C-alpha cells in the first residue's frame, strides 16, 4: 500500500464547487462572445437593397422582385468597388432571410476552380436540387435558388459554353447572376440570356459621404480634405477606400489621419517625387534622369504606379496634343510590357527618355 501511495500525489486544493464551475464556464463563454475584429468592408457592406448607392436601375428591378415579381437571370458589369457583389448578396438576404440564405445561394468567385468540370458537376448539381422550406418570419419566399458567379469574365470559354444549357434546363428552379468587370469577355449566348446592368462608377460626393459616415461611427479623426484625398488615391473604388481608411486608423492609433499617412498606406508615390521625375526629363540630362529613376526603384515604388501618376501629370500639362498622344502611347506600351514581366528599370528609362524627347521640343 505504501509503495502504491509513493507514486501518487495528494491534492490539497479544495474541490471545484458547482458555483465555481458555473462561474468559470460563464467567464469562458463571455470571452467567446467578445466581438471579433471584422474588416470594415464586410462590416459596412449593404445589408438590404435600399442601402445600395448610386445604382438606381438595378435597385428598381430588385425591389420589384422583392415585392413578388419574377427575377430574371442577371449580368452585372462595371468597375471594381461599385457594389456589384454587395447588391446581389443584399437582395438574396432579403429574398430568402437568414435561415434559407445558405441553402438557396451558391457563390463562386475567382479563387474557386471554375472550369468546365465545376459547371457540369457543382453548379449543375446545385441547380437540380429541389426547393423546399418557408421563412420563419412568415414573409413569402420565392420558389428558386440563386447561383452567383463572381468575376465571370475569368471563366474559360468552354465553361461559359457549358453554362448555357444549365441555365435553360434549370430555369424553373434556379436564377443565375454573373458578375464581371469586362462584359466583352462574356460569350454572346450567355449575355443574351441575362438582363444586363451596368454599374456606374461612384461619384466622389457619394464616396466621401460614405467614408465620412464610417469615420463617424468608428470615431476616426480625419478632415474633409483627407477624405477627398482618400477618394482620389482609391480611383473610384469604394472598397479600396474603406480598406485604406481602416489601415490608416490602425497605423495612427487614434491620432488624426493626414495625407502623408494615406500616401504611405495606398502605396502612392509622393507628388514631389513625380515632380522630380518630370523635372529630370525637362533638364535634358540623361544621367540625372537615370539617377532619379534608380532612386525611385531602390525606394521600392512600383513601376506601374509611376506610369499611372505620370499619365495624370502629362494629361494636365500644357503640352501640345501631338506631344501628349506620343507620350500616352508610350505609357500604354510600357504598361503592357510591365504586365508581361519586363524589367522595370529599362522600361521606366525608355518611358522617361520619350518624355524628355517630347519636352525638348518646347525649348
From Swiss-Prot:
It comes from Homo sapiens. Despite of the presence of a putative ATP-binding motif, this protein does not bind ATP. ATP binds at residues 78-85. One of its GO terms (biological process) is positive regulation of DNA-directed DNA polymerase activity. The modification N-acetylmethionine is found at residue 1. PANTHER family: REPLICATION FACTOR C / DNA POLYMERASE III GAMMA-TAU SUBUNIT (PTHR11669), REPLICATION FACTOR C SUBUNIT 4 (PTHR11669:SF20). The lineage of its organism: Eukaryota, Metazoa, Chordata, Craniata, Vertebrata. Subunit of the replication factor C (RFC) complex which acts during elongation of primed DNA templates by DNA polymerases delta and epsilon, and is necessary for ATP-dependent loading of proliferating cell nuclear antigen (PCNA) onto primed DNA. The RFC4 subunit probably functions as a scaffold on which the other complex components can assemble. The keyword Repeat does not apply. The keyword Acetylation applies. InterPro entries: AAA+_ATPase (IPR003593), ATPase_AAA_core (IPR003959), DNA_pol3_clamp-load_cplx_C (IPR008921), DNA_Rep/Repair_Clamp_Loader (IPR050238), P-loop_NTPase (IPR027417), Rep_factorC_C (IPR013748), RFC_lid (IPR047854). This is Replication factor C subunit 4. It holds the Pfam family RCF1-5-like_lid. Belongs to the activator 1 small subunits family. The modification N6-acetyllysine is found at residues 6, 13. It is linked to Morimoto-Ryu-Malicdan neuromuscular syndrome: An autosomal recessive neuromuscular disorder characterized by delayed gross motor development, gait disturbances, incoordination, muscle weakness, hearing impairment, and decreased body weight. Some patients are wheelchair bound and death in infancy or childhood may occur. Subunit of the RFC complex, an heteropentameric complex consisting of a large subunit RFC1 and four small subunits RFC2, RFC3, RFC4 and RFC5; the RFC complex interacts with PCNA. Forms an heterotetrameric complex with RFC2, RFC3 and RFC5; this complex has ATPase activity but is not stimulated by PCNA. The heterotetramer of subunits RFC2, RFC3, RFC4 and RFC5 interacts with RAD17. Interacts with ATAD5. Interacts with CTF18. Interacts with CNTD1; this interaction facilitates crossover formation. Keywords: Acetylation, ATP-binding, Deafness, DNA replication, Nucleotide-binding, Nucleus. The gene is RFC4. SUPFAM superfamilies: P-loop containing nucleoside triphosphate hydrolases, post-AAA+ oligomerization domain-like. Changing residue 354 to S: In a breast cancer sample; somatic mutation.
Amino acid at each position: 500500500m505504501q509503495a502504491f501511495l509513493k507514486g501518487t500525489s495528494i491534492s490539497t486544493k479544495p474541490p471545484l464547487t458547482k458555483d465555481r464551475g458555473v462561474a468559470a464556464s460563464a467567464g469562458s463563454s463571455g470571452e467567446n462572445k467578445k466581438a471579433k475584429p471584422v474588416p470594415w468592408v464586410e462590416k459596412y457592406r449593404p445589408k438590404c437593397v435600399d442601402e445600395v448607392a448610386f445604382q438606381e436601375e438595378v435597385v428598381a428591378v430588385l425591389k420589384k422582385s422583392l415585392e413578388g415579381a419574377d427575377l430574371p437571370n442577371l449580368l452585372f458589369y462595371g468597375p471594381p468597388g461599385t457594389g456589384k457583389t454587395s447588391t446581389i448578396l443584399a437582395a438574396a438576404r432579403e429574398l430568402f432571410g437568414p435561415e434559407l440564405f445558405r441553402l438557396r445561394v451558391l457563390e463562386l468567385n475567382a479563387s474557386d476552380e471554375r472550369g468546365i468540370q465545376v459547371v457540369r458537376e457543382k453548379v449543375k448539381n446545385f441547380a437540380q436540387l429541389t426547393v423546399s422550406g418557408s421563412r420563419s418570419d412568415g414573409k413569402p419566399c420565392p420558389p428558386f435558388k440563386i447561383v452567383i458567379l463572381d468575376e465571370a469574365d475569368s471563366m474559360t470559354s468552354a465553361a461559359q459554353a457549358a453554362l448555357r444549357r444549365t441555365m435553360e434546363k434549370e430555369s424553373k428552379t434556379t436564377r443565375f447572376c454573373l458578375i464581371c468587370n469586362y462584359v466583352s469577355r462574356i460569350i454572346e449566348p450567355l449575355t443574351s440570356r441575362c438582363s444586363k446592368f451596368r454599374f456606374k462608377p461612384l461619384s466622389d460626393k457619394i464616396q466621401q459621404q460614405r467614408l465620412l459616415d464610417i469615420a463617424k461611427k468608428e470615431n476616426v479623426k480625419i478632415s474633409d480634405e483627407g477624405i477627398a484625398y482618400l477618394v482620389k488615391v482609391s480611383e473610384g473604388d469604394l472598397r479600396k477606400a474603406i480598406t485604406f481608411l481602416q489601415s490608416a486608423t490602425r497605423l495612427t492609433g487614434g491620432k488624426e489621419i493626414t495625407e502623408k499617412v494615406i500616401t504611405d498606406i495606398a502605396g502612392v508615390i509622393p507628388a514631389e517625387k513625380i515632380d522630380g521625375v518630370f523635372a529630370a526629363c525637362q533638364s535634358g540630362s540623361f544621367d540625372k534622369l537615370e539617377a532619379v529613376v534608380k532612386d525611385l526603384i531602390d525606394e521600392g515604388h512600383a513601376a506601374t504606379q509611376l506610369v499611372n501618376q505620370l499619365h495624370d501629370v502629362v494629361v494636365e500639362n500644357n503640352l501640345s496634343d501631338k506631344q501628349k498622344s506620343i507620350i500616352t502611347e508610350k505609357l500604354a506600351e510600357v504598361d503592357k510590357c510591365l504586365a508581361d514581366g519586363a524589367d522595370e528599370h529599362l522600361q521606366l528609362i525608355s518611358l522617361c527618355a520619350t518624355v524628355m524627347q517630347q519636352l525638348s521640343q518646347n525649348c
